[in-house]
Design a protein with these regions (language model features):
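Metal-cofactor-binding active-site regions of metalloenzymes
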Residues: 1-197, 206-211, 218, 222-223, ...
């Protein structure tokens, strides 16, 4: 079967489950907010800033994360946070994304006086506006940071639970893995789960399969962010497959951080062929310089995914999202009808 075209993949209804708010700003917006908030940007215009922010020289995950200090400098006010969330949803909708879970750490947005509550409510307003205007459903995942104290993670878990009925659908842990084990934050995960909040966890990106094991067995994560090195542990891979634990795959980001040597050698193809529940995501649209359609194209061109396989990956995203069951079922039914129409067009 011939490879699907970019336009077909753009029109394919997609779910984005792993997208960082502070890694997905428009460079044009960064320039404008920098002037407005008197924050110095490392480049004078949007195109130069885009090139600067796109990571192509990282030695590892920690190198990749350094640029987030720049985006966070203009994410310290309510209007900025609302605008950035709105624009991310707008851009995603134009890329064929029907549902997006936007994740970020509100504790990083309170350096200039915002409360944690304000740092949650502003992006939620932006996502709600975008939903009304563009038809894209947007929800929030509150993220804790591995190298911060477990007490901070606990505070963020409590914050996420407080907004569980108001647009926050999950709790997450991110940041450099090496030397910052997920098990140190187990109490925060336990609090979130015991208050009926879904959990995901970055693992197996900057560290080995044991990091995934901690995320699954100690923290009780329902999904795993990246899981690039899960493949190193056959037993754990089988466990994740048997339990249908979703793997949030981010191809370009993994190549940038050296978690994978290339697109062609990424384990995504093997995960799919073994039946694992895999979902494609952008991770950071700005730092990785990608859209979700780009990631689907990489899977087609470098890993020989055909339309039917990528349609299955797209459905995995909707089936694995953290929406309530009834909302999820309605969304899946709509998506399946669109996929059938596209399938006839692609054949």
């Amino acid at each position: 079967m011939p490879l699907p075209t970019r336009e077909v993949l753009r029109r394919l209804p997609k779910a984005e489950l792993h997208c960082h708010l502070d890694g997905s700003l428009r460079p044009e917006t960064m320039i404008e907010l920098g002037l407005e908030l008197e924050k110095t940007m490392p480049a004078p215009d949007a195109q130069s800033l885009r090139e600067y922010m796109t990571v192509d020289d990282a030695r590892n995950l920690e190198d990749y994360l350094e640029r987030f200090a720049i985006t966070l400098s203009v994410m310290q006010t309510e209007p900025a946070l609302e605008r950035i969330a709105y624009e991310l949803a707008e851009d995603s909708a134009a890329d064929g994304v029907r549902y997006i879970e936007v994740r970020y750490a509100p504790v990083l947005n309170v350096r200039e006086g915002l409360s944690l509550e304000q740092a949650v409510e502003a992006p939620l307003r932006g996502l709600a506006r975008a939903e009304a205007e563009f038809g894209i459903t947007g929800r929030v995942i509150v993220t804790a940071i591995r190298n911060m104290a477990p007490s901070v993670s606990q505070e963020l878990a409590e914050l996420a639970v407080a907004y569980r009925q108001r647009g926050v659908v999950g709790f997450d842990l991110a940041g450099g893995e090496v030397g910052h084990p997920a098990k140190a934050h187990r109490n925060a995960f336990e609090y979130a789960r015991s208050h009926d909040l879904a959990c995901t966890c970055h693992a197996g990106e900057g560290d080995g399969a044991d990091s995934v094991r901690q995320a699954v067995h100690v923290c009780g994560a329902h999904r795993i962010g990246h899981a690039t090195r899960l493949i190193e542990d056959t037993s754990l891979t089988d466990y994740c497959n048997d339990r249908r634990i979703a793997l949030e795959i981010c191809l370009t980001s993994n190549v940038q951080t050296r978690a994978a040597d290339s697109y062609a050698s990424h384990p995504f193809r093997e995960y799919y062929d073994r039946g694992l529940n895999v979902v494609l995501n952008t991770d950071n649209r700005l730092m990785s310089g990608v859209t979700l359609t780009d990631e689907y194209m990489h899977a087609a061109e470098s890993l020989r995914f055909d339309f039917d396989e990528l349609a299955r990956v797209a459905l995995n995203g909707f089936e694995s999202c953290f929406l309530p069951h009834e909302e999820r079922v309605r969304l899946i039914a709509e998506v399946q009808r669109e996929i059938e129409a596209l399938r006839s067009m692609d054949s």
